[in-house]
């Protein structure tokens, strides 16, 4: 494609470690910066931009240290391109967020679907087992379609460390999952 996004989680524009994402456009073989984006509610120590993904006119950027209602619960932001301008379209939060979930540690977007990993989430009280959330876009609104977990979840599996989505499929990594050995890790396909 002709667009790329690069995250900079320790960027200090506006304050300490707020983070930023830089969107580049390729024209005639030359890449130039088209925009720098930050969330509308940017704050110190959000670490916005550790994870980024782009699909067509949409960019998703994580801020896994973001504090909204709970310390370090995390948030993800979707930006939309119109012409040469990029604007925030949505802020995604877990429907069941808690402190230190690291929601949005990993993010991906494909067309009208986005996936957000929450590696420290405690599904069913299983500490740091992790979860992932799938969102769907309808016009300019994004809504949670599903929350997914490992069928064999255990404490500290960190399901959601890495996520990807493509068409009707999603893959979620759990780097500390123990099926093949201590912390050997697994990838789950949905």
Label the predicted regions.
Residues 1-190:
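Conserved beta-strand/short-helix segments
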């Amino acid at each position: 494609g002709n667009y790329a996004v690069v995250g900079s989680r320790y960027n200090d524009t506006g304050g300490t470690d707020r983070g930023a994402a830089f969107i580049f456009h390729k024209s005639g073989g030359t890449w130039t910066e088209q925009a720098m984006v930050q969330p509308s509610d940017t704050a110190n120590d959000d670490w916005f931009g550790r994870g980024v993904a782009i699909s067509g006119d949409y960019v998703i950027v994580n801020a896994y240290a973001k504090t909204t209602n709970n310390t370090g619960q995390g948030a993800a932001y979707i930006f939309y391109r119109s012409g040469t301008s990029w604007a925030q379209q949505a802020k995604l939060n877990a429907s069941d967020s808690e402190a230190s979930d690291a929601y949005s540690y990993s993010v991906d977007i494909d067309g009208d679907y986005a996936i957000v990993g929450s590696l420290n989430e405690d599904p069913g009280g299983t500490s740091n087992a992790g979860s992932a959330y799938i969102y769907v876009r309808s016009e300019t609104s994004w809504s949670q379609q599903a929350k997914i977990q490992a069928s064999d979840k255990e404490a500290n599996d960190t399901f959601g460390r890495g996520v990807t989505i493509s068409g009707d499929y999603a893959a979620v990594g759990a780097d500390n999952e123990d099926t093949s050995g201590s912390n050997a890790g697994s990838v789950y396909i949905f």
